[in-house]
Structure formats: structure tokens, C-alpha cells
A protein has these predicted regions:
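C-terminal accessory/tail domains of diverse enzymes
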Residues: 2-157
Length: 157
């Protein structure tokens, strides 16, 4: 599984872990029932990997060989809905539901980029934000008191 990285809060870690757990369980069940997984062409995989790396949650992924695209956020919402019964069986409904929250916002990478931009390009602001969010236990978007202090401290430092 290729998953996102830089998850600073346990809520976000739990959400991504639940998504991975539910996906693996669902696909394993389907394979046990004789379902074969589609094999996307190599060019499609390379292009979607690039799009995801470049645009993150704002990416539009190619969904077929004809080049039709779908926004990542829309695909995630549908995937979470499809995996809801699996999450109920596995006891991770709350964590899987948190994927919706994570996908609706800028995500950790977006928050880190915003912190760096607010600090005039100082990459240390991203580290400071990660530390502050880990300590707080939840995301701290720009505009919140602690995040503003982190951004201001990075700009002053």
C-alpha cells in the first residue's frame, strides 16, 4: 500500500490505519470469493502516482484507459462509504469516519505548506507545526491560536 506520510496526530494515524485495514480486509475477502483485481496499465499507475505526489488531496486521478478523471476527495468519500460495513465488522467505524474529515481539509501536508508560507518560506515552521499538532493531539490549521503562535515564532526566529 502506498499511503500518505507525515501524519502528526493520533486521530489522523488512526484514520489512515483504519482505511488500510478495511481495504486489505475487503480485498482479501473478494479474492477469497474468486474476484480478480483489475490490473491498471503501467502508464496509468505512473501518471496517478505523479498526480497524487504533486497535488495530494487536490489531485484528479485517471480512472480508466480512456483518460476519464475523478477528484481524489470524491473517490475517498465513496471508498469510505463502500468500506463502512467492513469497518463495523472490524470495530473501527469511528476511525474510518475520520478519513472523511481528513480528506475534507487541507491534510497534514497542506497545513505544513501553509505554515511554511506564513513563515516566509522557513521550512522550520513545518517542523514546529508538527510538534505543536502532536502535542495538541489534533490538527491546528492556520487561524487557530497555537498554529498562529507557531507560525509567528517561525517568522520571528
Amino acid at each position: 500500500l502506498r499511503m500518505c506520510d507525515g501524519l502528526p496526530t493520533m486521530q489522523e494515524v488512526g484514520a489512515v490505519a483504519a482505511l488500510a485495514q478495511c481495504l486489505v480486509h475487503s480485498l482479501d475477502t473478494q479474492l477469497d470469493r474468486g474476484y480478480t483485481l483489475p490490473r491498471p496499465t503501467p502508464w496509468l499507475l505512473r501518471e496517478n502516482k505523479w498526480r497524487a505526489a504533486r497535488h495530494g488531496l487536490d489531485a484528479e486521478l485517471i480512472i480508466d484507459d480512456a483518460g476519464a478523471v475523478r477528484p481524489v476527495r470524491e473517490a475517498i468519500a465513496e471508498l469510505v462509504e463502500d468500506l463502512a460495513p467492513v469497518a463495523r465488522r472490524l470495530g473501527c467505524t469511528t476511525e474510518l469516519d475520520d478519513v472523511r474529515t481528513l480528506a475534507a481539509g487541507p491534510g497534514p501536508a497542506g497545513r505544513q505548506r501553509a505554515a511554511v508560507a506564513a513563515a516566509g518560506g522557513d521550512i522550520g515552521a513545518a517542523v514546529d507545526l508538527l510538534v505543536a499538532e502532536f502535542a495538541a493531539g489534533h490538527p491546528l490549521p492556520p487561524g487557530s491560536g497555537v498554529a498562529d503562535a507557531v507560525h509567528a515564532g517561525a517568522a520571528a526566529g
